[in-house]
Structures are given as C-alpha cells and as structure tokens.
Amino acid sequence: MSSGGLLLLLGLLTFCAELTPVSSRKRHPYCNLPPDPGPCHDNKFAFYHHPASNKCKEFVYGGCGGNDNRFKTRNKCQCTCSG
C-alpha cells in the first residue's frame, strides 16, 4: 500500500474512533468506583464519575487516600470517563 493510502486509512480510523461514544469503548475500570473521600480531613472539592447517569459529579475529598475515580476538574473527569 502506498504511503498516501496508509495516511488515508489512518485518517479514517481516527475519524471513526472520535465518533464512537465512550460507552461503547473500553472505559477505565476505576470510572465505576464509588466516590471515596479517603481518611484525611483536608476537605477539597473534587469530581467523580457517576456510572448510572454517565455524568461527573462533585464530592468532598479529604486530601489523601481514596481511589482513582477522583479528578481535579469536571473536564478531566468527563474526558476520562464520560467522553
């Protein structure tokens, strides 16, 4: 296959991947974990992915421990887990 053909194929695959919703792609397993504030009491706002609604919601994070379903911004949460 010529380099032009390979480039076209790569472009089409990239385009199709962008159109595929996250729900049908493999989602990070930690996106399904419940929010976990951890054992500390620093009380910072963070975001977690709520799998039933497929939305990112705010919760109070204690500042240490917890699990990986925790994001500093709603945007990072949505890009990682919601799409």
Curated annotation (Swiss-Prot):
Q: How does it assemble?
A: Heterodimer; disulfide-linked. The A chains have phospholipase A2 activity and the B chains show homology with the basic protease inhibitors.
Q: Where in the cell is it found?
A: Secreted
The signal sequence is: 1-24
Annotated function: Beta-bungarotoxins are presynaptic neurotoxins of the venom. The B chain is homologous to venom basic protease inhibitors but has no protease inhibitor activity and blocks voltage-gated potassium channels (Kv).
The record places domain BPTI/Kunitz inhibitor at: 31-81
Q: Disulfide connectivity?
A: 31-81, 40-64, 56-77
Q: The organism sits in which domain of life?
A: Eukaryota
Q: Name one GO cellular component term.
A: extracellular space
- Family as reported in the entry's similarity comment: Belongs to the venom Kunitz-type family.
What keywords are assigned to this protein?
Answer: Disulfide bond, Ion channel impairing toxin, Neurotoxin, Potassium channel impairing toxin, Presynaptic neurotoxin, Secreted, Signal, Toxin, Voltage-gated potassium channel impairing toxin
Q: In which tissues is it expressed?
A: Expressed by the venom gland.
Protein name as it appears in the record: Kunitz-type serine protease inhibitor homolog beta-bungarotoxin B5 chain
- Show the GO MF annotations: potassium channel regulator activity; serine-type endopeptidase inhibitor activity; toxin activity
Q: Which InterPro entries match?
A: Kunitz_BPTI (IPR002223), Kunitz_BPTI_sf (IPR036880), Prtase_inh_Kunz-CS (IPR020901), TFPI/VKTCI-like (IPR050098)
* Pfam families for the chain: Kunitz_BPTI
Taxonomically, what lineage is the organism?
Eukaryota, Metazoa, Chordata, Craniata, Vertebrata
